[in-house]
Amino acid sequence: MPELELCVGVGSRCMDISKLSVSYHRAKVAVHMAIVQKKRVIKFDECGLFRLLYMVEDKGILKELEAECLAALEEHDRRYHANYVETLHAYLKHNGSIQAVASEMYTHRNTVLYRIGNIKKILGNELKTPEERLPYHIAFYIREMQGWIYE
């Protein structure tokens, strides 16, 4: 018999029954985050940036931001069978550490340097400052949310 895994999402505290539906929807967000983050229990209040993105009413703007940031790299990956999107994600996750990206991707650091150089050219962005990197961080958060943010 297969083992079942249970994930629990906890909504926000609700003192008024009229706010129950808000708490329920927040619990749904939390359970999706529990699944994504492979946690058994997660509270909506612990979902960080995902809380803010979930609250954006016009979900189309989230799709647009993701596309603006990642479409050129996705097209390059499709055309040349590269993995620049994955490389950028690792680069951002490791705060620009070439060695950490190389270790995670089982790739030589010179290969990572070459890819990052090309990524910067494709994006027209040096990715040096937090302000330059932020839209791409958010785009990856949005991507992680797809499949449930648009429900």
Feature-to-residue mapping (PLM):
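Cytosolic nucleotide-utilizing catalytic cores of signal-transduction proteins
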Residues: M1-E151
